[in-house]
Amino acid sequence: MTYSIFDREQLVIGGLNERKNKVIFERDMVSLLQKPHAFSQEGTHLIERTVERIRVAKEKKSSVMLTFGAHTIKNCMAPVLIALMKEGWVTHLATNGAGIIHDWEIAFQGQTSEDVRANVERGQFGIWEEPGFYINLAIIVGAYENLGYGESVGKMIANEGLKIPEISTLYDTTTQYMESDPDKAAAAIDLAGTIKRFGLKAGWMPIPHPYKKYSVQYQAYESDIPFTGHPMFGHDIIYTHPMNHGAAIGRTALNDFLRYAASVVNLEDGVYMSVGSAVMSPMIFEKSLSMAQNLKIKEGKHIDNHYILIVDLAESDWDWQQNGEPPMDHPAYYLRYCKTFHRMGGEIHYLSADNRDFLLALYRQLKGEK
């Protein structure tokens, strides 16, 4: 059968300087001094319980994982996320592909979030040169360097540029690793092809990021804390650019999934917080926990004393901890981010809250403030 393939080379790609953004970081950022809206008695108790469990996890050197959707970045929560990292309250951060992109755009230009409706109408949504070129190139270079998805972008932001290898070096790498590490050999070929196709020069490519102090993945890279990216093909604006390369996405995203799974292995007595992620977080967690349990069972152990808190705006009148899984004719059964996590054992709670209020309240209580 013959199928049509969309030719991205035919796209008219705009520059970010042409794009109007809805979020200006220095105008909209959430300050550590800002107070959250008041919670109900039940919500306050849940946050206190979470703080208690984080303190225990920190004492026992167990994982404290914070996984979130892109709106946590778009809501300018970087100051809180960075403080949680720097003060040792979280050991792993994870987001989807959009979260990586919004964080990069903030580091690169201090603003993010285009008008989707208007730009789709004019055939321009997501079709921008800088994020498409630089983020994809960072991932292609990162695949060659055996980095993770988030790590590749964080390194580019931290160094404010990328090192482009000589073509001859890449060909030598291909020959050297063809049998011992075919993935690395393939990544070298991919990078060589990209360099030739786009006419890139070997050596240092400067890419200024004047707002990098606001980047969560930059701060994670500098602090040597995993910030993993978990993209899905076709979900993000970088897929519109001809620089996009599926093999590099796959190699770096797989590295990040395995790093995420390694943190789940250390989740006994630990804490997992899923904030505003209806699909990505529960899906990668269930596979990772199964893998982790597999290893623990081999050692005669089991992960049982883990704490899970799910935070989302949607209201839920079902008590998952007390009532278990609802019947299939109940709407709560179809809340994937509750149902999946409830099947993962441990202690699980659901909190209906805005991510800004939750993270601010969590941080303030960890600091001993009200």
Cite the ranges covered by each PLM segment.
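A general structural motif
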Residues: 43-48, 208-209, 231, 246-265
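C-terminal functional extensions of proteins
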Residues: 250, 259-263, 269-271, 278-370
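Short glycine-rich or small-residue beta-strand-to-loop segments that form or flank ligand, phosphate
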Residues: 62-71, 93-95, 271-278
